[in-house]
From Swiss-Prot:
GO terms for molecular function: levanase activity; sucrose alpha-glucosidase activity. One of its GO terms (biological process) is sucrose catabolic process. The keyword Plastid does not apply. This is Levanase. The active site is at D412. Optimum pH is about 5.5 at 50 degrees Celsius and shows an apparent shift towards higher pH values at higher temperatures. Substrate binds at S409, A410, S411, D412, Q428, W460, S461, R539, D540, E591, W679. It is an enzyme of class 3 (hydrolase). Catalyzes the hydrolysis of levan with endo-type specificity. The products of levan hydrolysis are a mixture of fructose and a series of fructooligosaccharides up to 12-mer, with levantriose being the major oligosaccharide obtained. Is not active towards sucrose. Pfam families: 3keto-disac_hyd, Glyco_hydro_32C, Glyco_hydro_32N. It comes from Bacillus sp. (strain L7).
Length: 921
């Protein structure tokens, strides 16, 4: 639903401001009537500002949702700010133009347009001169029933392309044009595909503007592509800056630096941004600066051939330090620059490489403003974010050692691959592939979006592999090796997205990704026939190497089955099997398949594992995860060891979806992780500023059991580096009802390892752990002897009412081994993961306790249990590992408003207390 806001604050031409009460008017996205608002518009028009020919309009631009500024009127007519937007009204049979001061070369320019007179034309002007006539025009002509892309100069042989549309006065329509070089693309409404796609070279740069002929039109939400981020308004600017498709374009020339300083003022800060250097120029991020940008620090990238070097400079150009090494840089590489300025320590990271390019101590500038700068040549800035360190990964429910995005969302993990010493993690974020890298699977560094939307559509889930022998032929100029990503192309304009498998590749260790021009689509939708491109479910490709048959195998979800393909060159794929259908279907749609081969421990057998996730369905209490064990034939067919209907659950909790394993692991391990959500409530969790977290990475193995070969999962060994000991039970002891072996220990992120034995007589009927306890809150992880059931009960875990479908009790059968049960429990600020009997049974659940609910206890009911061993480890924060672990009081709420005489109990606990929380503060 579009909303046009009427702010009754109008500026007169004499700069006298008339203030009135605020109001808001909301229109539908299309076919909305203007009649009900006519009286208000008339009232507003009577007080609206008008501009004379060629003069700047004294208008309140804040009343318009626009980042295009500095409007001047040309032609015959008037320009007004109304409660619904910017109104242009021409004299009869005349032209009127509003030309802005905003200049752009390559961009997306768009607006919502309402033509109020049936005979009028309304236009977006772009790449215009000052008078508006040396320009391109994107025109909505109601009388002719067309949208028209034309060169304003007219005449024979110049640009003039039309498309028929249905439009009428008083309705709102969205116009959008993308200009990149000589290519011009026009979009109508919310369509993904352009209705006009043409070439024109007459105008390559210029101003943005608006135009109306023979009547009146309203313009609102007038936007041009620009830098994303959380920067506040600039307080100073020098040099040339303009919006661009790539973000904010800065040009430093003739010895004059381009600088833009924003109002964000911080001392300890994490500052990050993406930038593109043009050739051998230099550009960077200003931090702890004065308002003019003449004092403070600058983290600078300097081009050196096909490399870049990092410098820490003072704002006056004095070099404080330079990186010992240089980093790869291709033409149009989008470099990610991250500055951590904490106290006297300054660290600068580039493109996720570790260690830091610069790590030093300096005391010259303890705090200040932040900004961007280009000191020579052209640079483009995008996604610039300034985060006070006190707020960095400290929000309510923010995980401490699980991967979660700093902002935006994380859903399906994609493209997990190891290559040249780094683990690459991609994940879905709004139909794009977000990207992070790690050297240990624990500590992650963010990189720019790897695979954004493209001409084919959105970029949904998929996988990546390392082509180390140049089997694809894509890496002849990059040392004969590189990375290939296979993704689901989804076009919103076509039936069911016309899902097909696209290809992208990287020749620089995953930092820069290119959509293949020679092989943009490697497998078309299987429903394609004749002119019909196909609308079948066909998504989530996962590619794995099959060494025994010297080939690669791809599995793709088909909704109620999995399609298998094989290839010897990673480009040409042959369908070999369709597995599933019928009795295999027990719940929702099949998605996100994975396929890999593992040895069976203690034998010479090797088996193939096919994993899937299933969408939300009442039969499975929402979404679910399961796997099949079998063989892969030389013909490329998967043969299941078990009959259809035999369900092998990957996870017994309710938040483990779209699991994927890493490709090309150097040590033979099979490691996987998943998105911790459920499709009954995928984005409903009560977090602010970010959505979604991933499970801890887990090593997968196959073992013989009394039921047959089954998959086991254990936390990866790398997690041990985060541990600090809290409690170790030196000898076995009996746990009885009423005794708490964990009394006084508090933590929000920790690990419990326990081995518990049921005696032959007098055994407890139930035992386990109460986790994240406080003020009546707790999550139970326990075992019931009757029925041999391990369980997680989160009914009192904290916030649970964000969805009616959020289930609270999860159980799994687990028989004791030698009368013993092993539990390994990993607790974080908003999750609990439980591994029973060395990972034979696994639970993954999210929880949302109050921050102060940090207690823990051991309990037993109806008898006794022998505590053979018990260890508790605090787990270090992976994003703030360098901060001092000083004791602090954690409250259950940060802000509270009370009426006079009202009272409310507050709860608190100690974090990082003496004895790791066991001894108080």
């Amino acid at each position: 639903m579009m909303k046009w806001f009427a702010k009754l604050i109008l500026s007169l031409s004499l700069a006298v401001v008339m203030a009135a009460s605020s109001a808001a008017i909301s229109f539908g996205a299309s076919n909305s009537s203007l009649d009900t608002h006519a009286s208000l518009v008339t009232q507003l028009d009577s007080a609206a500002s008008e501009a004379a020919e060629g003069k700047s309009a004294m208008i309140n631009e804040s009343a318009i949702n626009s980042n295009v500024t500095g409007w001047k009127l040309h032609g015959k007519g008037r320009m007004e700010v109304t409660g619904e937007g910017l109104r242009l009204t021409s004299d009869p049979q005349e032209n009127v133009m509003a030309i802005s001061e905003t200049v752009a070369d390559d961009f997306i320019y768009e607006a919502d347009v309402m033509v109020t007179d049936p005979q009028a034309d309304a236009t977006l002007l772009f790449r215009s001169g000052e008078d508006g006539w040396s320009s391109y025009m994107l025109q909505l002509a109601l009388g002719a029933g067309v949208i028209r892309l034309k060169d304003a100069s007219g005449g024979e042989g110049v640009l003039n392309v039309e498309r028929k549309v249905e439009a009428k006065p008083g309705d709102i329509y969205h116009l959008r044009v993308k200009a990149e070089g000589t290519r011009l693309q026009v979009y109508w409404g919310q369509q993904y595909e352009p209705v006009i796609d043409t070439e024109a070279a007459a105008h390559r740069t210029g101003r943005l503007g608006l135009h109306v002929w023979n009547g009146s039109a309203l313009f609102q939400n007038i936007r041009v592509s620009d830098m994303s981020g959380n920067t506040l308004e600039p307080i100073s600017s020098q040099g040339l800056w303009q919006p661009d498709l790539k973000g904010l374009k800065g040009t430093g020339e003739d010895g004059l630096e381009a600088k833009k300083v924003f109002r964000n003022h911080e001392a300890d800060v994490v500052l990050e941004g993406d930038l593109i250097l043009n050739g051998q120029g230099s550009a960077g991020l200003l931090f702890r600066s004065n308002a003019q940008g003449t004092e403070g620090y600058a983290a600078v990238l300097q081009g050196e051939g096909e490399r870049v070097r990092v410098y820490l400079k003072k704002a006056d150009g004095t070099i404080l330090h330079e990186s010992r090494v240089t980093y790869p840089s291709q033409r149009e590489s989008r470099h990610h620059l991250e500055v951590k300025a904490i106290g006297e320590r300054i660290q600068i990271f580039v493109d996720g490489y570790e260690p830091a390019a610069i790590d030093m101590v300096d005391t010259a500038f303890p705090s200040g403003y932040h900004g961007v700068m280009a000191s020579s040549g052209i640079a483009y800035f995008q996604d610039v974010y300034i985060t006070p360190y006190a707020s960095y990964y400290t929000e309510k429910y923010r995980p401490q050692y699980h991967y979660s995005p700093i902002r935006g969302s994380a859903s399906d993990p994609n493209g997990l691959v190891y290559f040249e010493g780094e683990y690459h993690l991609f994940h879905q974020d709004g139909g794009q592939w977000a990207h992070a890298v790690s050297r240990d699977l624990i500590h992650w560094k963010r990189l720019p979006i790897a695979l954004p939307w493209n001409d084919l559509g959105h970029v949904w889930s998929g996988s990546a592999v390392a082509d180390t022998t140049n089997a694809s032929g894509l890496f002849g100029s990059s040392g004969g090796k590189g990375l290939i990503a296979y993704y689901t192309s989804y076009n919103p304009d076509r039936h069911n997205g016309n899902q097909k498998i696209g290809l992208a590749y990287s020749t620089d260790r995953g930092r820069t990704w290119k959509y293949s021009e020679e092989h943009p689509v490697v497998i078309e939708n299987p429903g394609k026939t004749g002119e019909d491109p196909g609308g079948w479910d066909f998504r989530d490709p996962k590619v794995v190497r099959d060494e025994a048959n010297n080939r690669w195998v791809m599995v793709v979800s088909g909704g109620d089955h999995i399609r298998l393909f094989t290839s010897t060159n990673l480009l040409n794929w042959t369908l070999t099997d369709q597995f599933g259908y019928g009795a295999y279907i027990r719940g929702g749609v099949w998605e996100c398949p994975d396929l890999f081969q593992l040895p069976v421990e203690g034998s010479k057998k090797r088996k193939w594992v096919l994993m899937i996730s299933t969408g939300a369905n009442p039969n499975t209490q929402g979404s679910d995860a399961e796997y099949f064990i079998g063989d892969l034939t030389p013909e490329g067919k998967f043969i299941n060891d078990n009959p259809a209907g035999t369900v092998l659950k990957t996870d017994w909790g309710k938040e483990y979806y779209a699991s994927m394993s890493f490709s090309d692991m150097p040590d033979g391990r099979r490691i996987m992780l998943a998105w911790m959500t459920n499709w009954d409530y995928p984005f409903s969790f009560p977090t602010t500023g970010w959505k979604g977290q991933l499970s801890i990475p887990r090593q997968v193995s196959l073992k013989e059991t009394e039921e047959g070969i089954r998959m086991h999962q254990t936390p990866i060994e790398e997690l041990a580096q985060l541990r600090s000991p809290v409690l170790t039970s030196p000898t076995a002891r009996w746990g009885t009802s009423g005794e708490n072996l964990l009394k006084g220990i508090t933590s929000g992120a920790y690990e419990i390892e326990a081995e518990l034995e049921l005696p032959p007589t007098g055994a407890a009927s139930e035992f386990g752990f109460r986790l994240r306890e406080g003020d009546g809150q707790r999550t139970l992880v326990g075992y019931r002897a009757a029925g041999s059931k391990m369980f997680v009960d989160r009914s009192a875990s904290g916030m649970t009412d964000f969805s009616d479908l959020f289930s609270t009790l999860h159980e799994a059968p687990l028989k004791p081994e030698g009368n013993r049960i092993k539990l390994r429990i990993l607790v974080d600020e908003s999750s609990v993961e439980v591994f029973g009997n060395d990972g034979r049974v696994v639970f993954s659940d999210v929880i949302f306790p109050d921050p102060a609910s940090r207690g823990m206890s051991f309990y037993s009911e109806g008898g006794k249990v022998k505590v053979v061993s018990l260890q508790v480890h605090a787990l270090q924060h992976i994003w703030r590992e360098d901060e001092a672990k000083e004791p602090r009081v954690v409250m259950d709420t940060e802000t509270l408003e009370l009426s006079l005489g009202q009272t409310k109990p507050l709860f608190a606990s100690i974090d990082n207390g003496q004895g790791k929380g066991a001894d108080g503060i």
